[in-house]
């Protein structure tokens, strides 16, 4: 389904944003990223090649390139580092910083 990008949002030409995703004011989606059925609040950022499905990113939250989120809620100003895979309804507190490859949950279970 269609996606909605609000004022000053940036979505790379080769990003796949669909499934009713809302990209908030000033939020961004990098090249090659996939965002489906998700909400990116104002100023949130999804890095190149990241995958975000059925998730919520709080204001100013950052998902680093190549990270994957499936059914996750990420608090305001949180940072999800490269190589993290979050799934199964995981919640990340506002301001939390997950260093690269520190969390890996399979979304296949």
Model-derived features with residue positions:
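Left-handed beta-helix
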Residues: 1-109
């Amino acid at each position: 389904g269609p996606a909605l990008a609000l004022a000053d949002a940036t979505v790379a030409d080769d990003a796949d944003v669909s499934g009713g995703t809302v990209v908030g004011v000033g939020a961004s989606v990098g090249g090659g990223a996939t965002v489906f059925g998700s909400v990116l609040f104002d100023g949130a950022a999804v890095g190149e090649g990241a995958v975000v499905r059925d998730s919520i990113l709080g204001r100013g939250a950052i998902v680093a390139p190549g990270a994957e989120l499936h059914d996750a809620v990420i608090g305001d100003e949180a940072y999800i580092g490269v190589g993290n895979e979050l799934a199964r309804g995981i919640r990340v507190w506002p301001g939390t910083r997950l260093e690269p490859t520190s969390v890996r949950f399979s979304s296949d279970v």
